[in-house]
Each structure stands twice: as C-alpha cells, then as structure tokens.
Regions:
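Extracellular glycan-recognition surfaces and repeat-rich motifs
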Residues: 26-84
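Hydrophobic residues embedded in beta-strands of well-ordered beta-sheets
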Residues: 61, 72-78, 152-157, 167, ...
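Carbohydrate-binding surfaces in secreted/extracellular proteins
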Residues: 106-108, 179-221
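Predominantly extracellular/luminal cell-surface or secreted proteins
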Residues: 5, 130-134, 160-162, 197-201, ...
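Short, aromatic/His-centered strand-loop micro-motif at the edge of beta-sheets
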Residues: 161-186
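Secretory/extracellular carbohydrate-interaction modules
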Residues: 77-158
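Ligand-recognition surfaces built from glycine- and aromatic
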Residues: 2-9, 22, 215-261
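Generic beta-strand structural signal
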Residues: 65, 69-72, 147, 162, ...
Length: 261
C-alpha cells in the first residue's frame, strides 16, 4: 500500500505531460473509450480490406507486456492480435487547464522484432502514430511507418491525415532503415504545422548504406489551425501480423510520452 501525506488537489496533478512505460497498466478495453485512461483493443482498419489474410484472435489479449526476442530488447508492450491499437484521450475540464492547450507532441520508443529494417512480416503492413485525434471518430494526424514491396530491408514513412477512419498521405515519402532496435518516433502539431522525426542509434548495414536509405526521417506538412483543433487524443495502430511464436513480426513499445502546450 502507498499513502500520500496530504489530500491531492488539482494543482498537484500534472496534466500537460503524460508518460508511461506500460508495465503497470491494465491492458484491456474500456467501455465507451473512457477519457483519462489507456484503452487497449484491436480493430481492422478500413484500408487493410485487400490484405490476402488477416490474423484472427491468436491469443486472448490484444496486447501483452513481457519479453520476446530478436530486435526487441528487454521487456515491453507488444501486440497480441493483428490490428492492435492504443487510444488515449485526456480528461478535459476547466479546473485541469487542458482545454486551452491546442498544441501536442508525442515521443514513442520502439523495438521492431524484425532486425533487418523491414519492420513487418509483409508488404502493406504498417504502424500509425497519430496525435490531435478524436479517438472515437478517428479524425486526426500522424506518421505512417509501412513496409512496401520495393524493399526487404527498409520501410517507408510519411505523414497522414485521418478522416473518419480513412488515412490519406499528406507529405513526401521517405525510405529509411531507422525502424530497427532503439527507434525513436516523434510527432508534433504546433499552430497548424504537423511534423515528425524518426531515428535510431543502431548503425545501418553496408548494403543499406550502399542503397542510400535515409538514416533518419524529418517530415513537415501544413494542416491548418481549425480542422481537428479540439482533438487531443493519441492513437497507435499496428496492422502487422504476429509471425511465428506469435511475436516475431511484432513491434515492442518501451515507452510513450505526451506533451500538451
């Protein structure tokens, strides 16, 4: 048991910065996508309907916390179903002060189990990291990390806008080898400008260097100040298959931080 020496007031609660490494969170879906709590579930996105196969429920949970292997180091949160997603929408109330903060950024720490740079089991599978999102209607902005048929040792990254659950590209596409162990993914919205960066300290292979893949990614797009101005949610959506042993195609998440400003 833990005790605090005095009653907790609204001033004691930091509402503009949220961080978790997932290890002590209950990994289940909350009815009604409740605000102020982390919501873990699985759903098939609309743009995956042409996938030849889709892994049905292989386990009883959409997410697991623990150790796997290959490129995923240590312990962390990883997918238990294809289409696994995380949604978080903060509680907004005048006494909390969050309703006046329209800008937002997120930093995600990720280790793909795939260690060659391709990130996912098959072409077309992707990870979306979205901010300024209505997590019910799925309207917002983000970064897509996707494996394509063109590369077996790299992924493509580009900015997206979600409109009622349908994603569309809103930036140039960058082919990169940085989606490997130790990948850091940063997405930011500030005054109508969406930007994203991705990088890693893992060195590229000789072949990756010869092929000229970007070692890191920086993307920017103007999205306007009015559209999605009231949205404050985070969406992380992984459409990759699980692979053998139910983890060899997964991506381990070690931590996420959200800042409102």
């Amino acid at each position: 048991q833990c005790f605090y020496e005095k009653a907790i007031s609204p001033e004691d609660v930091e509402t503009d910065r949220i961080w978790t490494d997932f290890h002590n969170l209950p990994l289940y879906s909350h009815a009604g996508n409740e605000k102020g709590v982390w919501n873990f579930d699985a759903k098939r996105p609309a743009d995956t309907c042409d996938f030849e196969k889709w892994d049905r429920e292989k386990t009883q949970a959409s997410w697991h916390y623990g150790a796997t292997g290959d490129g995923s180091k240590g312990e962390g949160l990883y997918q238990g179903m294809q289409g696994a997603r995380i949604r978080y929408t903060p509680t907004t109330a005048p006494e909390m002060g969050t309703e006046t903060k329209r800008n937002m950024e997120v930093l995600l720490e990720a280790d793909p189990a795939k260690s060659a740079g391709q990130g996912f089991g098959s072409a077309g599978q992707y990870l979306d990291v979205c901010i300024k999102t209505d997590t019910d209607t799925l309207d917002g902005y983000g970064l897509r990390i996707i494996r394509t048929a063109a590369h077996s040792d790299a992924v493509s990254m580009y900015l997206i806008q979600y409109v009622r659950g349908q994603a569309q590209c809103i930036s140039r596409e960058v082919v990169t080898n940085c989606f490997v162990t130790g990948c850091r993914i940063w997405v930011r919205y500030e005054n109508g400008i969406l930007s994203a960066k991705a990088w890693t300290v893992t060195e590229p292979t000789v072949v990756q260097q010869e092929r000229g893949y970007a070692r890191g990614v920086e993307l920017t797009a103007e999205v306007g100040r009015r559209e999605n101005a009231e949205n404050t949610g985070l969406l992380i959506w992984h459409t990759g298959s699980l692979g053998t042993e139910n983890w060899r195609n997964t991506t381990m998440l070690h931590g996420v931080s959200i800042l409102y400003f």
